[in-house]
Amino acid sequence: MQQRRPVRRALLSVSDKAGIVEFAQALSARGVELLSTGGTARLLAEKGLPVTEVSDYTGFPEMMDGRVKTLHPKVHGGILGRRGQDDAIMEEHQIQPIDMVVVNLYPFAQTVAREGCSLEDAVENIDIGGPTMVRSAAKNHKDVAIVVKSSDYDAIIKEMDANEGSLTLATRFDLAIKAFEHTAAYDSMIANYFGSMVPAYHGESKEAAGRFPRTLNLNFIKKQDMRYGENSHQQAAFYIEENVKEASVATATQVQGKALSYNNIADTDAALECVKEFAEPACVIVKHANPCGVAIGNSILDAYDRAYKTDPTSAFGGIIAFNRELDAETAQAIISRQFVEVIIAPSASEEALKITAAKQNVRVLTCGQWGERVPGLDFKRVNGGLLVQDRDLGMVGAEELRVVTKRQPTEQELRDALFCWKVAKFVKSNAIVYAKNNMTIGIGAGQMSRVYSAKIAGIKAADEGLEVKGSSMASDAFFPFRDGIDAAAAAGVTCVIQPGGSIRDDEVIAAADEHGIAMLFTDMRHFRH
């Protein structure tokens, strides 16, 4: 099998025209004949490039408002024809070999994301000729190069220059993989969209099925292989969504340290998503996917110092997230005080990076600032299936809370209640969080009974010498019995925030009244499993 194939004729037909003129100029300068369609052909001609319209090449005009352009034997024969095997039949029918196909597809995702997009709009943005050419070229990668990503343009020209106008089989095969990934993702988007429209289409509902089509097709891109998974006997890799719109661990840049582990990524995600809840300078320290210390402060140094005091023992080897730039003073405090696996922040100063560089094992990630949180889906794998739900972006403000006890909370209790409610959302259920003066003072996570989570939170506070008296307590779900309130009162809690909704709410409220505790209902639960 010949490893190299010269590129003498290329067909270019793209929706995303970024870089296409420069790429076409580079091809033409190297003697490549250019074929093109529609808007791409007009653009290239306007730039003075010698380009042949596909309709002139085939002798068949574009028709049906552009629905039929490239679906012709002279196009697909030129792409699919096997060099050295189909030459005679190609010559008989005046089919010229096409050595490169440059295609990206109609912007279906952008179309359906637009407010007010109708099914008819979506249908008109389903590309037919494009995917057909992509698949034809990818199938015949032995002889044809298929280019679907503008990010490959420069590398292709460099390789052609290094190989006297040819591309290697290895490159053509790699391009074919990208092509099939491209069409698979495209078809998945269409299938998901159509699947979500089934009830409305059949008149069963006035609304579409929403985010949950009857068949779910997912496309993720491998970002990196991991040394191992959650445990050393498990293999693992990290896959990310394409075109992620929110600052996240998936989009973060590692600026220092050794490769991230599977557990590093999971814990960093937990820390970053928690710290995003706060507008003030905040710090979140996570261990085994649970916050072990959270605080807001006048600066990130102040926030870190307060978060660390919650549970210094658990903070050892933890993940630290900030919602402001990592500065030198804070970096020095962390490095001097504890062993840390990962620090993530929107940015890091040069001075801070010089300080953390002294500890080679410390991984530093920057993720950029985040704006409004982006709705999406969460997944949980079960044996033989996948649970899918909307991302939990729910949160309540002070105006939405219901005071259900005789005593009203003080202003400070209310602030602390809202603070620890945000933290409880990210603690594994059953979750109890004690907070005072905008810092956690005790966290009880992952217990099978809520009362034991409450007791653990109190024990944590006592172990660190943190005063619970006058603190607020958050519970991620309702109290099924009064025992959790009794445990909180014994520890010194004076305000409780919880969803409510238990059949024993009256009993729980009565317990709070007995202890002089103010209780707030959110009417929103935050289970986390």
Swiss-Prot record:
Signal peptide: none annotated. Its EC number is 2.1.2.3, 3.5.4.10. GO terms for biological process: 'de novo' IMP biosynthetic process. Keywords: Acetylation, Hydrolase, Multifunctional enzyme, Purine biosynthesis, Transferase. Residues 1-148 form the MGS-like domain. Transmembrane segments: none annotated. The modification N6-acetyllysine is found at K287. GO terms for molecular function: IMP cyclohydrolase activity; phosphoribosylaminoimidazolecarboxamide formyltransferase activity. GO terms for cellular component: cytosol. Pfam families: AICARFT_IMPCHas, MGS. It catalyses: (6R)-10-formyltetrahydrofolate + 5-amino-1-(5-phospho-beta-D-ribosyl)imidazole-4-carboxamide = 5-formamido-1-(5-phospho-D-ribosyl)imidazole-4-carboxamide + (6S)-5,6,7,8-tetrahydrofolate; IMP + H2O = 5-formamido-1-(5-phospho-D-ribosyl)imidazole-4-carboxamide. Pathway: Purine metabolism; IMP biosynthesis via de novo pathway; 5-formamido-1-(5-phospho-D-ribosyl)imidazole-4-carboxamide from 5-amino-1-(5-phospho-D-ribosyl)imidazole-4-carboxamide (10-formyl THF route): step 1/1; Purine metabolism; IMP biosynthesis via de novo pathway; IMP from 5-formamido-1-(5-phospho-D-ribosyl)imidazole-4-carboxamide: step 1/1. The keyword Transferase applies. Gene3D superfamilies: 3.40.140.20, Methylglyoxal synthase-like domain. CDD domains: IMPCH. Belongs to the PurH family. PANTHER family: BIFUNCTIONAL PURINE BIOSYNTHESIS PROTEIN ATIC, BIFUNCTIONAL PURINE BIOSYNTHESIS PROTEIN PURH. The IMP cyclohydrolase activity resides in the N-terminal region. This is Bifunctional purine biosynthesis protein PurH. It comes from Escherichia coli O17:K52:H18 (strain UMN026 / ExPEC).
